[in-house]
């Protein structure tokens, strides 16, 4: 189904935003509600479910934290995330140096964490049962952990040398955190340990640094501004401004050396790419200029390019229940990429026509022509 993703003229997302969209998140409980955050501080919540039961429908905005809201972010919202266990709470972080914990029902902040520098990224563990820590990457090289239970943000992970652009908890081990920095390094941490850092990933797998310490290891020859675990937590995918994407074995820290070719990445801040869940094989959806490049994760093959936005794509999010993709762009639009409906299989297909039914969909266009989109 992922191989047949396309813009669908019967599906639209209500246009609310007046500036570029930086971040999207779909709640994992029902897969129904989506948050978006934009570059002027506004947050919008959408209902993705088709309540009209008609083939053609628009995903409606249920509410927004707009410019007139007393607690709206003053500057660009860089990350939004639902509380993993239910839809009663969500989080947002911003260039206004805050992380806000929102009560969905009242649309009021239940808590606000303040930082000394710009906040690039934050993440809550999708599997944690023993802690309520939010990892936060800021302009400081220190990774900060905010505790929802105590309200404290005193726990700090030290080791990076420049700003931390991306953070992600492992979906396999609740105390393991991955961070990516402008220093070219990706670090894995066990937040229970006093020393913290488990390893610093080495793109050369030790070949060039056997005589030197682990401190010399780099994951990319540029800023690391995106990272994401596979859904099983066994691998970590990272992206850097060296125009490279790398796949790592998350338990050994080994670079798997999968070659994705040149992955253009000029973003000076975090890049929000997505990984599929429940597909075989699994795919990575990577913002690539005004398009989205779709790669098979374990072979590195570029399967297709999704075209539809008019400006730079900043983020995308995968909806696993229906294997749909949503993307946000500087053009102020959120686009829905829907698997093309399968052709009905007729009972009286002749044997001669069977080979045509088995064309590899990877070689078909995965977007609509402009006529179809009209």
Language model: regions and residue ranges:
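Loop/turn segments within WD40 beta-propeller blades
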Residues: 25-31, 81-87, 123-131, 150, ...
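Intrinsically disordered terminal extensions that flank WD40 beta-propeller domains
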Residues: 1-45, 49-52, 346-374
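Internal, well-ordered interaction modules that form the hydrophobic cores of assembly/scaffold domains
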Residues: 93, 165, 169, 180-182, ...
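Signature of short aromatic-glycine-proline-rich micro-motifs recurring in repeat-based ectodomains
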Residues: 21, 77, 222-226, 270-274
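Long, well-ordered mid-to-C-terminal structural blocks that present hydrophobic/aromatic surfaces
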Residues: 223-250
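Terminal intrinsically disordered, low-complexity extensions flanking WD-repeat/beta-propeller proteins
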Residues: 1-2, 206-208, 255-272, 277-282, ...
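Conserved strand-to-loop turn within each blade of WD40 beta-propeller repeats
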Residues: 37-40, 92-96, 136-140, 179-183, ...
